[in-house]
Design a protein with these regions (language model features):
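Active-site rim elements
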Residues: 159-166, 201-203, 223-229
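Low-complexity, Ser/Thr/Pro/Gly-rich disordered linker/stalk regions
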Residues: 17-107, 113-119, 130-134, 139-144, ...
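Beta-strand acidic-aromatic groove motif in beta-rich domains, primarily in extracellular
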Residues: 119-127, 186-188
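Short, aromatic/His-centered strand-loop micro-motif at the edge of beta-sheets
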Residues: 153-174
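Short tryptophan-centered beta-strand motifs in secreted/extracellular beta-sheet-rich domains
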Residues: 37, 109, 171-182, 189-191
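Fungal secretory targeting signals
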Residues: 1-23
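Short, solvent-exposed beta-strand-to-loop segments that form ligand-recognition rims
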Residues: 193-212
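Substrate-binding/catalytic groove segments of enzymes
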Residues: 146-148, 181-190, 198-200, 221-225
Length: 245
C-alpha cells in the first residue's frame, strides 16, 4: 500500500511540474534577431551547408552576397566560363545554428523579400535536414512562374505543396512559418503571406530532427530555362527566428 501511494505521489509531482511549464508564448527566445545581417558572419555562413551547388544552373559564390543597410542582396550573374549545367554565379547563406522542434515546443520564422519571379529565377527561404533527408520545409520558394510556393516533404513522393499568386513582386512582402509540435511526433506548419494564413501542412516525425535555415538564389532547374541574360537580384531583410521550445 505504501509503495502504491508513493507511485501515486510521484505521478502527481510529475503532473504538477508539467502544469507549471510556462505557456508556449512565454517561452519565446530570439535565436536569430531581425538585424542579423548587420553582423552577417556572427549568425550566418556562406554557401549551402553542403557546398556551392544544388539542383540548378547557379554555383554559389561569396562575392555575390552583399549587405547594405540591413538588406541582404543575392545577385545571380550570367556566366559563360562555367561547365554545364552551371550558367550563373549567385549567392547563398545558411544559419550557423541548427533548429530542432522539441516535444511541446516550436519555432516562429519570418522574413521580408523582394523576389524575382521570371522564368529561370529560383530564390528560396527554406529549412533542410541537418542530417539525412527529409525533413524539408520550403517556407517560401519562387520557381519562375509568378507564384510563391509553400511545401513540406515527408518523402520525395509525399509532398504537401501549395502555389499562390504573388502580386507586385518588385515590392516587399512578408512571409512567416509557425512550426508547432502536433502530437509528440509530427510538426504542424502554418504558412503566412503578408500576415494572411495560406495553408497548414504537417511534417511526419519532424520532432527532434535538426533543421538548417537556408537563404539562396538558385537559377534554372525547376524554374525553367533559359534564365535571365542580365544580372538579377533577390533581396531579403528582417529575418527572425524565435524558439518556443
Amino acid at each position: 500500500m505504501q509503495f502504491k501511494n508513493l507511485i501515486i505521489a510521484l505521478h502527481g509531482v510529475g503532473a504538477s511540474c508539467s502544469a507549471l511549464r510556462p505557456p508556449i508564448e512565454r517561452r519565446a527566445t530570439t535565436e536569430i534577431p531581425s538585424d542579423s545581417f548587420n553582423s552577417l558572419e556572427t549568425y550566418w555562413n556562406y554557401l549551402y551547408p553542403w557546398g556551392a551547388t544544388h539542383n540548378g544552373g547557379a554555383r554559389m559564390d561569396e562575392e555575390h552576397v552583399s549587405v547594405t543597410d540591413g538588406v541582404l542582396t543575392l545577385t545571380a550573374e550570367p556566366r559563360d566560363d562555367q561547365e554545364d549545367p552551371i550558367h550563373y554565379l549567385s549567392g547563398a547563406i545558411h544559419a550557423k545554428s541548427t533548429f530542432t522542434v522539441s516535444a511541446g515546443g516550436g519555432y516562429d520564422i519570418s522574413a521580408e523579400f523582394i523576389a524575382p519571379v521570371a522564368r529561370g529565377t529560383w530564390p528560396a527561404f527554406w529549412l533542410n535536414a541537418a542530417s539525412g533527408w527529409p525533413p524539408e520545409i520550403d517556407i517560401a520558394e519562387w520557381k519562375g512562374s509568378g507564384k510563391i510556393s509553400f511545401n513540406t516533404f515527408n518523402t520525395s513522393d509525399e509532398v504537401a505543396a501549395l502555389d499562390r499568386d504573388y502580386p507586385n513582386p518588385g515590392e516587399w512582402h512578408s512571409v512567416r512559418a509557425e512550426l508547432r509540435d502536433e502530437n509528440g511526433h509530427d510538426v504542424r506548419v502554418k504558412f503566412f503571406l503578408d500576415g494572411v494564413e495560406q495553408t497548414t501542412q504537417y511534417g511526419r516525425d519532424y520532432i527532434g530532427a535538426g533543421l538548417r535555415l537556408i537563404v539562396n538564389y538558385q537559377t534554372e532547374g525547376s524554374s525553367g530555362s533559359p534564365g535571365p541574360t542580365t544580372p538579377t537580384t533577390f533581396q531579403v531583410r528582417n529575418v527572425e527566428v524565435t524558439s518556443l521550445n
